[in-house]
């Protein structure tokens, strides 16, 4: 947990409440939260080496303290399958952000291994003034906003309670397998919820966590987009 504390303290000391995604993944590592392979780079040359090391296909995401919702400014490009495509995507990424976000600080680019499609779910957490740390689970992607398919629990929680939380959502039916699809790894998703609960309860500076989407597979699951917001506690 020392590395997570160092990341949070450094960002707060620099006046940043939004943890860069590559550092959010480093925090995830300490709490047993699965995520794709990734590298943070500052130049196109570093990026092409990172993509080769990770293996195509890859995704690129802008890393900027001024850009929270990356997709809104064209700050995410997926499905990059070659060195030539990477070069074009890197240039497009920079062009998009400059055109749509204006003069913003760009720290670099996150190069991330593209993950196979799975059942999209979401988990997260927040620190409530009345109840303390709370963990959320629900349908992933835009469905969480459209259908409000979410369930909440106080954190920390054990795996059995996490499974009951899953059952409280419509997402549980999809995870069990529909129209001949293989069932997803319910134990793996429950473990992710437990570890997300540990994260929000053990690190008091955490204000909000948003892991969306999470890809659930027949074996295991993977957080493919991570947002962590922190605040100084008096």
Language model features: what each stretch is:
Residues 1-234:
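ATP-dependent carboxylate/acyl-activation modules
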